[in-house]
């Protein structure tokens, strides 16, 4: 089971390659032999989702099973499945982010890799910082969170 936590500042080179941090690379090697799926996020946030292959194989059939006559479901399928790229970390622990995904998330050199338990999000550093600045002021706490003690 995945337990991805923390935020990591990383860089992407001009060819679209990025080195996965050592700790994350070790977790991915143990969990899935370094085989991952990178895809577009369906939310309004412009970031990418990085799944270890076993987690993706649990999620993929659920997305495929959505009613394709429903416009919102079809859009979700096209966005997530249509942009999914199965890849394997190279010997140096790097991945090549496809140009279409770089464009979707406005990725440039400086990036943030953010752990969310079963997956990671990959953000441009600029978008991540803007999200953090805006989120505290814009969002109300969901009722489920009111009983949570941190």
From Swiss-Prot:
Its main location: cytoplasm. Keywords: Cytoplasm, DNA-binding, Repeat, Transcription, Transcription regulation. GO terms for molecular function: DNA-binding transcription factor activity; transcription cis-regulatory region binding. GO terms for biological process: negative regulation of DNA-templated transcription initiation. HAMAP family: MraZ. Forms oligomers. This is Transcriptional regulator MraZ. The gene is mraZ.
């Amino acid at each position: 089971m995945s337990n991805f936590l923390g935020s990591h500042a990383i860089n992407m080179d001009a060819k679209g390659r990025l080195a996965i941090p050592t700790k994350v690379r070790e977790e991915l090697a143990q969990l899935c032999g370094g085989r991952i799926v990178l895809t577009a996020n369906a939310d309004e946030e412009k970031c990418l989702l990085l799944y270890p292959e076993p987690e993706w194989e649990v999620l993929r059939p659920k997305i495929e099973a959505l009613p394709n006559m429903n416009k919102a479901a079809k859009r979700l399928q096209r966005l997530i499945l249509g942009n999914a790229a199965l890849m394997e970390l190279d010997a140096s622990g790097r991945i090549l982010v496809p140009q279409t995904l770089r464009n979707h998330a406005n990725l440039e050199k400086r990036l943030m890799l953010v752990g969310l338990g079963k997956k990671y999000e990959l953000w441009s550093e600029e978008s991540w910082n803007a999200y953090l600045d805006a989120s505290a002021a814009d969002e109300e706490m969901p009722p489920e969170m009111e009983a949570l003690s941190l």
